[in-house]
């Protein structure tokens, strides 16, 4: 353990040492909330402990081995602002017997400033559309053929654990897995830490994104699966990328596979509940449509699974924008829909996959352990049929 981490652990433990207990007979645990979305636990395991389990509000979060009387720092993420959480720290011996339990509660602070978006400030995801952008000559035809006909079933994936994308955060003590591969790009070896609570989406894509907070790496998986009997992870495709990078698996004008069809980093364009709560989304969105163009990759995409050869089909990587002169404030829409619409005017959305419907992507909250979408008033599979779909435009395409 680094001196910095050891110092943090020691400082946190000072306020949590059990008065009247012999040193080492019980675990010592300190807790702090450095921001609105995370809690830091400082754990000094009890004598005889070989493993520690961490639970939040009764839900298992992680489990990991510990060394004799060596402090451990663990950060829990995906928390809600101004909310009380109760942690249970269980110490087990080499036989798996429980030898000590400590419980602590903490209240996260209110959110200060905007929630930080993933990927670099220079990423295409985080760049607003300039004034008077070039519009593609085929824009009207693409909107008329690939968007407007599907408006009746248009939706926002929020509240769906089937099609939204779940996110999990690993710590340096989270279990390290050699992630098996069953279909694409299996010639590379991928080892990554995955916390106990991580679970993929329940729909047919089984997406899962894991960010290692210590190494600053992101694991994107498609058709992810955890085998409980062998405690092993596999995926049909798995890729490691940079959550502070440019937002796709390989560089622009390169072609490569990814956990999503367009070659993007899997959490690119994903709307989070905190962004609705704060009233603004500071990045472009990810969308799908059934009518995608075959054999055409539009920058910044690096791959495609487009289905139709017609020029009126939208190529993956295309960026759409809601007419910025459309008066969103005047609409009788719920607050969350206005937040979405303003983002579509300022940042637009990139076509990232072929879907069964016209949809905008959101975070699945099954890995949070609570329904964050209900807290901001967004229903599951919220309809977007009332968006002015004919007033969207496709910005100038560039083949990659």
Region annotations inferred by a language model:
Residues 20-48, 81, 98-111:
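Pro/Thr/Ser/Gly-rich low-complexity, intrinsically disordered linker/stalk tracts
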Residues 15-16:
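C-terminal motif of bacterial Sec signal peptides marking the signal peptidase cleavage site
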Residues 1-7:
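Bacterial N-terminal signal peptides that target proteins for export
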Residues 111-400:
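Short, surface-exposed polybasic-aromatic patches that bind anionic ligands, especially phosphate groups
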Residues 51-82, 94:
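Recognizes extended acidic, P/S/T-rich segments that occur
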Residues 63, 101-103, 221:
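Residue-level detector of high-confidence beta-strand sites
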